[in-house]
Swiss-Prot record:
Annotated transmembrane regions: 40-60, 97-117, 136-156, 201-221, 222-242
Family under the similarity heading: Belongs to the ATPase A chain family.
Keyword Transmembrane in annotation: yes
UniProt keywords, alphabetically: ATP synthesis, CF(0), Chloroplast, Hydrogen ion transport, Ion transport, Membrane, Plastid, Thylakoid, Transmembrane, Transmembrane helix, Transport
Function: Key component of the proton channel; it plays a direct role in the translocation of protons across the membrane.
Keyword ATP-binding: no
Alphabetized CDD domains for the sequence: ATP-synt_Fo_a_6
This protein's name: ATP synthase subunit a, chloroplastic
Subcellular location: Plastid, Chloroplast thylakoid membrane
Length: 249
């Protein structure tokens, strides 16, 4: 043990064991107010938000009594989000439709942007642009936002009585119930991040090896799985909110 401790201390002193300094790929940073900001994520997230806001403006700008094809599409998306929210949350789903819808649409468009938008055209001093959900910072932020939402939902309905769920059905399960609230955002964030990162890496490798026909089916499969991941994230977020309001597992 003494030898092992000495070896670890030596590595730390020499700077070879600094886990916080390990990075995957190259990153481009901005310095804002003394903070180091991940510029790639901000740029791609702003593009996705602009696409969503532009689509929303087009959807509500001139509604017709006899809906057009575009209006039908947006109404279908809204009904789909309402159905997901109602199924998972229950009768009090109404106030949560905007939140669940925002999560679903942001993740869906972010995932698809990695395959459909020509990010490579934009040249950066370091690194390159990719889907926002390809970065662990984005998925962790979305997962933490979901955690805040279901804590707020439970506390707003039950007050401090919400915390009684941690000792149900028996106080022996208190550590497990507390641990569950930590594993929820972890599972949400790493599932989304891992799937999107793996999908983009597979496409990049196949394009470099066989740049003609073979990558195309994989890209279509990636689009499908990207949509499924957005649905899974939104459905689980709604389920957690419904669970916190109902108080069952």
């Amino acid at each position: 043990m003494t030898v092992l401790s000495c070896s670890i201390n030596t590595l730390i002193k020499e700077g070879l064991y600094e886990i916080s300094g390990v990075e995957v790929g190259q990153h481009f940073y901005w310095q804002i107010g003394g903070f180091q900001v991940h510029a790639q994520v901000l740029i791609t997230s702003w593009v996705v938000i602009a696409i969503l806001l532009g689509s929303a403006v087009l959807a509500v700008r001139n509604p017709q009594t006899i809906p057009t094809d575009g209006q039908n599409f947006f109404e279908f998306v809204l009904e789909f989000i309402r159905d997901v929210s109602q199924t998972q949350i229950g009768e009090e789903y109404g106030p949560w439709v905007p939140f669940i819808g925002t999560l679903f649409l942001f993740i869906f468009v972010s995932n698809w942007s990695g395959a459909l938008l020509p990010w490579k055209i934009i040249q950066l001093p370091q690194g390159e642009l990719a889907a926002p959900t390809n970065d662990i910072n984005t998925t962790v932020a979305l997962a933490l936002l979901t955690s805040v939402a279901y804590f707020y939902a439970g506390l707003s309905k039950k007050g401090l009585g919400y915390f009684s769920k941690y000792i149900q059905p028996t106080p022996i399960l208190l550590p497990i119930n507390i641990l569950e609230d930590f594993t929820k955002p972890l599972s949400l964030s790493f599932r989304l991040f891992g799937n999107i990162l793996a999908d983009e890496l597979v496409v990049v490798v196949l394009v470099s090896l066989v740049p003609l026909v073979v990558p195309i089916p994989v890209m279509f499969l990636g689009l499908f799985t990207s949509g499924i991941q957005a649905l899974i994230f939104a459905t689980l977020a709604a389920a957690y909110i419904g669970e916190s309001m109902e108080g069952h597992h």
